[in-house]
C-alpha cells in the first residue's frame, strides 16, 4: 500500500503528499505513529493536484507534525457488523469504547459509504407503530419502516422524547435497535447506556442477549467524527436489515449536528459557503444519508431522528432540508413547554403522511380531525379572549374553549424516563384507550370534570380518579 507524508495541518483537515499512487476519494488512511496511544484515521476528501490529497481527521490531530507518515488502507472506513456488536458501544471508526473487552464471536467488516437500495428493492409498509404517547399516536402517528423527525429548539425536550420512544418501542420491539449519538452531550450518552442496562435492552454480562448497538461521536469530538458517525451506525443497521432480515429501529440524536459538522469541514476544506453559512453540498450530504434509511423486501429500518432547530426557526436551511425526507414530523414548541405541558408537542404543527382513513381507520381519523379543529378554533379565538375576555364569546365558542383547554392538558403525559424529575410514574397509553378518551372529550362526556384533572395523566379513567380526589380535597377544605 502507498504511503503519504503530512505537508499541512489545519485543525481537522490534513494535506498529505503521495509519491507513488494517490488513494481514492473516501479511502481511509492509517497513521504509522500513535497519537495519544492510538492510531489516527484520516478520510480522503479531495485531490488538489501535485500528488497532494486533502483529508478529514476522525480524531484530534494534537501531536501531529509535518513529515508524519500515513498508509493508504485501500478501502473506506470499515466497521464491525453482525450480532456480536450487540450490547457494545463503538466510535466512528468501529473501535470499542465501552471498556468491556474485545468483540466476541464472528463479525464482518463493512464500508460506511454505500449506495442506497435500488427502486426494485424498496418496499412500503402501511402499519402504524404504536408509541404509547397520546399526542403522537392520535395526531401524528408513526409508520413502521418510516422516517420520523423530532423538531425543537434548545431545551424543549427532544432527547427526553427520543429516550421515551426508545424505552416504549425498543422494549416491546422484538428486533434490534441501533442508536447514533451525533454531536450531543456525553452525559446523555452515558445516561442512555445505563437506562438500557436497567431496562434489559443491553445485557452487559451476556452481550449476545442484548437488543441494541450504540455508536457515539459526541460534542467534544472533531467535526470528522461527528460528520461520519451517523453513517457508521447506519451501516450496522443496514446489515441487520439485509443479512438478518430484521425490522430495525434506528435512532439518531441529533441530525442537525451531522449538518453542523459538515459545515465546519466544508469551511476548512476551502469551499465557498451557501445560505446562512452552510456548506454548498448541504442537500447532497443529507440526501446521501437519508436515502439509505429505507425499507426493503429483506427487512425495514424505522428511523427516529431528533433535529435541533437553531433559534426556533423552522425555515433555517438545516431543518428545512431534513423536512423533505420525513414521513412524520413531531414539532416541539417552546410556547407549549412554557405552559408546563410535556411532551411539548405542537398538535397543529406536527404532521404525518399516515393520517388518512385508509391507513389508521375511519374512527381514529375522525377523532384526530375533530381534535385538530377544536384546537385550531381555540387558537383563532385567543386574540378575542385576550382583548374582550371570555364573557364576549358565544355559548358555542365557550364550550369549544373549555374542551380545547381540556384537550391541551390531556395531551400531556408523565414519561417513564422522566420519573426522577417529575416524581410521577410513567404511563404507556394503548391506541384504543387514546382514541376512546379523546372521543369522549370531544363529545362532551367529560364537560363536568375540572380542567386540572386532565393534566399529566394517562387514560381518561385516571382523569376521572384525579377529578374525584380534587373534589375530595376541596370538600375537606370547606
Swiss-Prot record:
CDD domains per record: ATP-synt_F1_beta_C, ATP-synt_F1_beta_N, F1-ATPase_beta_CD
Subcellular localization, as worded in the UniProt entry: Cell membrane
InterPro entries linked: AAA+_ATPase, ATP-synt_VA_C, ATP_synth_F1_bsu, ATPase_a/bsu_AS, ATPase_alpha/beta_chains, ATPase_F1/V1/A1_a/bsu_N, ATPase_F1/V1/A1_a/bsu_N_sf, ATPase_F1/V1/A1_a/bsu_nucl-bd
Membrane topology: Peripheral membrane protein
Primary location class: membrane
GO annotations of cellular component type: plasma membrane; proton-transporting ATP synthase complex
GO molecular function, one term: ATP binding
EC number(s) reported in the record: 7.1.2.2
SUPFAM superfamilies, per the entry: C-terminal domain of alpha and beta subunits of F1 ATP synthase, N-terminal domain of alpha and beta subunits of F1 ATP synthase, P-loop containing nucleoside triphosphate hydrolases
Catalytically driven reaction(s): ATP + H2O + 4 H(+)(in) = ADP + phosphate + 5 H(+)(out)
Protein keywords: ATP synthesis, ATP-binding, Cell membrane, CF(1), Hydrogen ion transport, Ion transport, Membrane, Nucleotide-binding, Translocase, Transport
Coiled-coil positions: none
SMART domains hit by this protein: AAA (SM00382)
Disulfide bonds: none
Binding site for ATP: 152-159
Subunit structure comment from the entry: F-type ATPases have 2 components, CF(1) - the catalytic core - and CF(0) - the membrane proton channel. CF(1) has five subunits: alpha(3), beta(3), gamma(1), delta(1), epsilon(1). CF(0) has three main subunits: a(1), b(2) and c(9-12). The alpha and beta chains form an alternating ring which encloses part of the gamma chain. CF(1) is attached to CF(0) by a central stalk formed by the gamma and epsilon chains, while a peripheral stalk is formed by the delta and b chains.
Function: Produces ATP from ADP in the presence of a proton gradient across the membrane. The catalytic sites are hosted primarily by the beta subunits.
Similarity comment: family membership: Belongs to the ATPase alpha/beta chains family.
UniProt-recorded name of the protein: ATP synthase subunit beta
Amino acid at each position: 500500500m502507498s504511503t503519504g507524508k503530512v505537508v499541512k495541518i489545519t485543525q481537522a483537515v490534513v494535506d498529505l503528499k503521495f509519491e507513488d499512487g494517490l488513494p481514492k476519494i473516501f479511502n481511509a488512511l492509517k497513521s504509522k505513529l500513535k497519537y495519544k496511544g492510538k492510531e489516527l484515521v484520516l478520510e480522503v476528501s479531495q485531490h488538489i493536484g501535485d500528488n497532494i490529497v486533502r483529508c478529514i481527521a476522525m480524531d484530534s490531530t494534537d501531536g501531529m507534525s509535518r513529515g508524519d507518515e500515513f498508509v493508504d488502507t485501500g478501502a473506506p472506513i470499515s466497521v464491525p457488523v453482525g450480532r456480536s456488536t450487540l450490547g457494545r458501544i463503538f466510535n466512528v471508526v468501529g473501535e470499542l469504547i465501552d471498556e468491556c473487552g474485545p468483540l466476541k464471536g464472528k463479525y464482518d467488516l463493512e464500508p460506511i459509504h454505500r449506495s442506497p437500495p435500488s427502486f426494485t428493492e424498496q418496499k412500503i409498509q402501511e402499519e402504524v407503530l404504536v408509541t404509547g404517547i397520546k399526542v403522537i399516536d392520535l395526531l401524528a402517528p408513526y409508520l413502521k419502516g418510516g422516517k420520523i423527525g423530532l423538531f425543537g429548539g434548545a431545551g424543549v425536550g427532544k432527547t427526553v422524547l427520543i429516550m421515551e420512544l426508545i424505552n416504549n418501542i425498543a422494549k416491546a420491539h422484538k428486533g434490534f435497535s441501533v442508536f447514533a449519538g451525533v454531536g450531543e452531550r456525553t452525559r446523555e450518552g452515558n445516561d442512555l447506556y445505563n437506562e438500557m442496562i436497567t431496562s434489559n435492552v443491553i445485557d452487559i454480562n451476556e452481550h449476545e442477549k442484548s437488543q441494541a448497538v450504540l455508536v457515539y461521536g459526541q460534542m467534544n469530538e472533531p467535526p470528522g467524527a461527528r460528520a461520519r458517525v451517523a453513517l457508521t451506525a447506519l451501516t450496522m443497521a443496514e446489515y441487520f436489515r439485509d443479512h438478518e432480515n430484521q425490522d430495525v429501529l434506528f435512532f439518531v440524536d441529533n441530525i442537525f449536528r451531522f449538518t453542523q459538522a459538515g459545515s465546519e469541514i466544508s469551511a476548512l476544506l476551502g469551499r465557498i459557503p451557501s445560505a446562512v453559512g452552510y456548506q454548498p453540498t448541504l442537500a447532497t450530504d443529507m440526501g446521501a444519508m437519508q436515502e439509505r434509511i429505507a425499507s426493503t423486501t429483506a427487512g425495514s429500518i424505522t428511523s427516529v431522528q431528533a433535529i435541533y432547530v437553531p433559534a426556533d426557526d423552522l425555515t433555517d436551511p438545516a431543518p428545512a432540508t431534513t423536512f423533505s425526507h420525513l414521513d412524520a414530523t413531531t414539532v416541539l414548541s417552546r410556547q407549549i413547554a412554557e405552559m408546563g405541558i410535556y411532551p411539548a408537542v405542537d398538535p397543529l404543527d406536527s404532521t404525518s403522511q399516515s393520517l388518512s382513513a385508509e391507513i389508521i381507520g375511519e374512527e381514529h381519523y375522525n377523532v384526530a380531525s375533530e381534535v385538530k379543529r377544536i384546537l385550531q378554533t381555540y387558537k383563532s379565538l385567543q386574540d378575542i379572549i385576550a382583548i374582550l375576555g371570555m364573557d364576549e364569546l358565544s355559548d358555542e365558542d365557550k364550550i369549544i374553549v373549555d374542551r380545547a383547554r381540556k384537550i391541551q392538558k390531556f395531551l400531556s403525559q408523565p414519561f417513564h424516563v422522566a420519573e426522577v424529575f417529575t416524581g410521577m410514574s410513567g404511563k404507556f397509553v394503548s391506541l384504543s384507550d387514546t382514541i376512546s378518551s379523546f372521543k369522549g372529550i370531544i363529545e362532551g362526556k367529560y364537560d363536568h370534570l375540572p380542567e386540572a384533572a386532565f393534566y399529566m395523566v394517562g387514560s381518561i379513567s385516571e382523569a376521572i380518579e384525579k377529578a374525584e380526589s380534587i373534589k375530595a380535597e376541596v370538600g375537606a377544605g370547606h
